[in-house]
Swiss-Prot record:
InterPro entries the record matches: DNA-bd_RFX, RFX-like, RFX5_C, WH-like_DNA-bd_sf, WH_DNA-bd_sf
Protein name: DNA-binding protein Rfx5
Chain positions with Phosphoserine modification: 10, 184
Highest taxon, organism lineage: Eukaryota
Biased composition (Basic and acidic residues): 1-10, 277-309, 465-476, 489-498, 648-658
A single Gene Ontology CC term: RNA polymerase II transcription regulator complex
Modifications made to the protein after synthesis: Phosphorylated.
Length: 658
């Protein structure tokens, strides 16, 4: 036993000098192991070693044999401590660059891990983490994700709910620009601390040039490049370097500001030397743009003043680029004010014309007819003007007889001539209207009468001393019968006169019938007058109906100017005395009711528009022809009405009832 002890100690004593020769390898291995073991484990190992040193050799051998040979349980617990190393950084960077939060997307766990594993294999410088450690890192970066099991029966998979793959993968980060390796002997003895700043500046300048060429943007420092990458999300904003850059950004800006100011001053000095004077090119480049925006609203005087200012300021520009830009711009002209715009000479004059409508009957469609009226010289005519007219009167003149209503044309004899104008005294002029006179008058041939049977007509306006503008359009509403060239009211009036003569002849044979409201004449006269008035008329028919109305009024009223009127009145009185007082009262009442029915008829106003044209001779000829036709029709109607009114007076006095 005594011999075995020294033999057992001999390897230790012999091993020490051998260990001294090979002391480099164990020390390096121990240092590496200590770096991978935590302080708590190291303290436990040191405590165990102190206890083991008290054991005997057999005890130590027994302890050695009892140590576990397979992978120990402590290796799994030691891996989380390794996450702060290079493998953790690679996994963290890959997750931030390839994944992003999205609440409506799910990714299978296995597909995410397979992509990470391929990335590590492509680098060939780090081994991939286990699936458990990889899942822990994902939960640290995206704490809101949830694990879900999705898929059909037999094909279900566990997924990360709340993340998705990025559609735009960010660029890999730029390599570090710190020159820590410059202290190594590989850089050579030429590298010294003095030129180190120059190397850093040169490297930063090259990097900025490269970034400008790639990103199509100018950068003044490497810090701006890094900030641009962070702002555009080209690199991860949650990395440690990003936090350091954000924290130290203000301090670096303060340090960089003086250098940028000096660079700006040097640039300004160079530009001023190139221009040959003080810094003035920037000021005249802006006023032309401002004046372009304001030139549209300025007055011509102010625009000319600003134009002179531009002309004076442009030569002051020293840069040829500014001069070329100003030369290419068009000449600015002031906008013309609204007051200088010449108005259109033509004006629209609208006059109303009283046209009778059918009492209680349906309204007929009234077309609109355009008439071209050339300027016509003044047409004089002497006629009374006591009735209302449409428009002003043109020219004074003595009247030979009073008239109770508006008339169309001018009268030269005792009686009412139509006139365009309202006045209680005698007037001289031609107008557009309708009226009746108590004295037999003669209508001049120059009275303006509207021709019928045409939609576009040329008619002259009577006696207007003022100059007329050409191209004035007026429209008149004319019934359909007139527009189509028909003249049904003439036939109706003839038929009515024939009916009255036949009815009067029949009454002579037998005893007249009595009606509760009055005699037959009393009821027939208003209907006749209403039918004549309500029927749509042409201008020629207006003359005929006006003549008949004048005769009716003449018969109904006891007094009337003119010798012809008195003679007719005497004949009527003599015959009335023979017939009896009853028939005389009936005739007077019928004439009065006819007049009242005519007065109660409401006139319908219509719009009239006239277009003055160039033709004057044709208008005068049309006016003359229509006036002659109107006078002839008036005379014919006058005779018919007298016959129809005098026929009932030749009744047999014996046939009248007691």
């Amino acid at each position: 036993m005594a011999e075995d002890k020294p033999d057992a100690k001999s390897p230790k004593t012999g091993a020490r000098p051998q260990g001294g020769a090979d002391a480099g390898e164990p020390t390096t291995l121990l240092q590496r192991l200590r770096g991978t073991i935590s302080k708590a484990v190291q303290n436990k190992v040191e405590g165990i070693l102190q206890e083991v040193q008290k054991f005997s050799d057999n005890d130590k051998l027994y302890l050695y044999l009892q140590l576990p040979s397979g992978p120990s349980v402590g290796e799994k617990s030691s891996e989380p401590s390794l996450l702060s190393n290079e493998e953790y950084m690679y996994a963290y960077r890959w997750i931030r660059n390839h994944l992003e939060e999205h609440m409506d997307t799910c990714l299978p766990k296995q597909s995410v891990y397979d992509a990470y594993r391929k990335y590590c294999e492509s680098l060939a410088c780090c081994r991939p983490l286990s699936t458990a450690n990889f899942g822990k890192i994902i939960r640290e970066i995206f704490p809101d994700i949830k694990a879900r099991r999705l898929g059909g029966r037999g094909q279900s998979k566990y997924c990360y709910s709340g993340i998705r793959r990025k559609t735009l993968v960010s660029m890999p980060p730029l390599p570090g620009l710190d020159l820590k390796g410059s202290e190594s002997p590989e850089m050579g003895p030429e590298v010294s601390p003095a030129p180190r700043d120059e190397l850093v500046e040169a490297a930063c300048a090259l990097t900025c040039d490269w970034a400008e060429r790639i990103l199509k943007r100018s950068f003044s420092s490497i810090v701006q490049v890094a900030r641009y990458l962070l702002q555009q999300h080209l690199i991860s904003a949650r990395s440690a370097h990003a936090h350091v850059l954000k924290a130290g950004g203000l301090a670096e800006e303060d340090e960089r500001a003086p250098r940028e100011r000096s660079l700006c001053k040097s640039k300004n000095v160079v530009e001023s030397l190139e221009g040959g004077g003080p810094k003035k090119p920037e000021r005249p480049a802006q006023p032309p743009k401002e004046q372009e925006a304001r030139a549209g609203t300025d007055l011509p005087g102010r625009a000319e003043r600003k134009k002179s200012v531009i002309d004076s300021s442009v030569p002051a520009a020293s840069k040829p680029q500014v001069n070329a830009l100003v030369a290419r711009l068009p000449v600015l002209l002031p906008r013309a004010p609204r007051s200088l715009i010449t108005p259109i000479s033509g004006t629209l004059k609208v006059a109303t014309l009283p046209l009778p409508t059918r009492v209680g009957g349906p309204q007929t469609a009234v077309p609109i007819i355009n008439m071209i009226l050339p300027p016509v010289p003044t047409l004089s005519g002497a006629g009374p003007g006591p009735g209302p007219g449409l428009g002003p009167r043109f020219g004074p003149g003595p009247g030979l007889g009073p008239g109770p209503g508006p008339g169309l044309g001018a009268g030269l004899g005792p009686g009412l001539g139509p006139g365009l104008g309202a006045g209680p005294g005698p007037g001289l002029g031609a107008g557009l209207g309708a009226g009746l006179g108590l004295g037999p008058g003669r209508v001049p041939p120059r009275a303006p009468i509207l021709p019928r049977g045409a939609e576009n007509r040329e008619v002259g306006i009577s006696s207007d001393p003022r100059p007329h503008d050409k191209g004035i359009k007026r429209t008149a509403e004319v019934p359909l019968s007139e527009a189509s060239g028909q003249d049904p009211p003439v036939k109706e009036m003839k038929h009515e006169t024939q009916d009255t003569t036949v009815s009067e002849a029949k009454r002579k044979r037998g005893r007249p019938r009595k009606k509760p409201g009055g005699s037959g004449e009393r009821n027939a006269t208003p209907e006749k007058s209403a039918a004549i008035v309500n029927s749509p008329r042409s201008p020629r028919l207006l003359w005929e109906t006006w003549g008949s109305k004048r005769e009716n009024n003449f018969i109904g009223r006891p007094e009337g100017p003119g010798p012809g009127g008195e003679a007719e009145r005497e004949t009527v009185l003599v015959q009335g005395q023979q017939d009896g007082a009853v028939s005389k009262g009936e005739r007077s009442l019928s004439s009065q009711e006819a007049k009242e029915a005519e007065d109660k008829i409401p006139p319908v106003t219509s719009k009239v528009s006239v277009i003055k044209g160039r033709i004057q001779k044709e208008a005068l000829q049309l006016v003359k022809g229509e006036a002659d036709a109107a006078t002839q029709g008036n005379k014919g109607l006058k005779g018919r009405v007298l016959q129809s009114s005098l026929t009932p007076e030749h009744k047999d006095p014996k046939a009248t009832p007691p």
